[in-house]
């Protein structure tokens, strides 16, 4: 039977000093012997998805104490990708994921905590905490701050549900008046919470449900709704139970690596494909799997993408459908239920709240459940009042969305498409693969071929789009923006948004070794691996070349002869130390980002660090 980790600092004569310090934090004699639970919060006033978390850590802490544990809260950093977007601030977003994972490890191991509740929400925070949970492998429960309500705006006499991306596109559309743009801006983000569509933050919070590490509703119940409070309360009780089961009952099944095993990662990726999640989720699931020491790779994602249909389309893939609509249709448990009925899930996987995923679906899938409380839970609705306060309203829809033929969530027989919402493409320009969010690609451009216009920075591409140098039929290539080449693998939300504002969203392709925001739609292909900075073929593309894309057959190719590519490769290598670097780009790369670039790996590996490669260790 494993001993409580915290005994290292709470027991024995030689720990008198440590106990003295614990006492100074409020612990009493009766607390030495209880599980010490880390409450890992991420409150910040910089990020709307986290601005309401300040008191929620203490809410969880009080519930932990009521259940017989000792709670100790600390904070991680949190970057707002939307505010960091479109300038050098975005260089720091993906690297912050590693800092978050490390900071959790540092705090939990330095203080010998026995278990943890991870209070996350936005883009890199949930992945960073997930990586830490898999790395530490102590009992853990995830609870997110929840999605924000979709904005509502009246334009030309019609009411539309809007979000951040709509405001960005409107601002770049010269046909929109300043007044309408300002109306859109003021309406797009009305409440606290993670941005309202199936963007990266909400995608990841949904995936924790499929991994079995969070409670039902974690990904979909609104930040402002009173029902979300129950998740925080239950997280506090659940983590104490898990800690006791492991340390006192010798039940290792409650550990993150045994819950989120290979089959659970397959379930999560299956959900991701079915709901058309953010392409960033591929990076983060690969990274978390690596921390769990699982051999889960791009090949597995490719395999799953060929058999899983698209069962839901949510903003940005379609307008007027947001997370509040997904919740009304039964949330993530409803999508998992449809996948189960299609024979696409392994329901024997365990969860932090149920013996198996199958048992969880029997209670929480609204097509199976007979529970009136479950149906009431999924009728939670937006309040329609601007608010930065959690649990500030308790409005409910009159009815659930149970339409599985034409509703927000479809059954397999009425899927939006036979192919799922994400796909892996391979070809000479992406030998290790690249990712496209097919749920956001118009059917007319699933196959596409066009002349290339090459840019070695996002800024140059944006300038070309806004000055009308990109025309229908073009393939825009942005390179040297990968994990190492950026460094930091910037998101390309501005280029894709500006293409839409110019009416080119269905007429152009954008290819990059960088990545895309969860808010991106259109023929946007990212994570091209190997990246240009590592000698990838994308570094040899020239203006006027043609690139052919065939999503149904999962291929992408640079239509240039092997002899010509070999010649270009020799010319590039002849540049010496300057080889495989951008020719004219001026970018201030800080020491912190240089350190990240030295240790990071390919997007095909989740852009995780490889210390062994850098220092030559086996």
Swiss-Prot record:
Its cofactor is [2Fe-2S] cluster; Mg(2+). It catalyses: (2R)-2,3-dihydroxy-3-methylbutanoate = 3-methyl-2-oxobutanoate + H2O; (2R,3R)-2,3-dihydroxy-3-methylpentanoate = (S)-3-methyl-2-oxopentanoate + H2O. Binds 1 [2Fe-2S] cluster per subunit. This cluster acts as a Lewis acid cofactor. It comes from the Bacteria. [2Fe-2S] cluster binds at residues 122, 195. Pfam families: ILV_EDD_C, ILVD_EDD_N. The active site is at 517 (proton acceptor). Pathway: Amino-acid biosynthesis; L-isoleucine biosynthesis; L-isoleucine from 2-oxobutanoate: step 3/4; Amino-acid biosynthesis; L-valine biosynthesis; L-valine from pyruvate: step 3/4. It is an enzyme of class 4 (lyase). One of its GO terms (biological process) is L-valine biosynthetic process. Its EC number is 4.2.1.9. GO terms for cellular component: cytosol. The modification N6-carboxylysine is found at residue 124. InterPro entries: Dihydro-acid_dehy_C (IPR042096), DihydroxyA_deHydtase (IPR004404), DiOHA_6PGluconate_deHydtase_CS (IPR020558), ILV_EDD_C (IPR056740), ILV_EDD_N (IPR000581), IlvD/EDD_N (IPR037237). Mg(2+) binds at residues 81, 123-124, 491. One of its GO terms (molecular function) is magnesium ion binding. Belongs to the IlvD/Edd family. HAMAP family: IlvD (MF_00012). Functions in the biosynthesis of branched-chain amino acids. Catalyzes the dehydration of (2R,3R)-2,3-dihydroxy-3-methylpentanoate (2,3-dihydroxy-3-methylvalerate) into 2-oxo-3-methylpentanoate (2-oxo-3-methylvalerate) and of (2R)-2,3-dihydroxy-3-methylbutanoate (2,3-dihydroxyisovalerate) into 2-oxo-3-methylbutanoate (2-oxoisovalerate), the penultimate precursor to L-isoleucine and L-valine, respectively. Homodimer. NCBIfam families: ilvD, PRK12448.1. This is Dihydroxy-acid dehydratase.
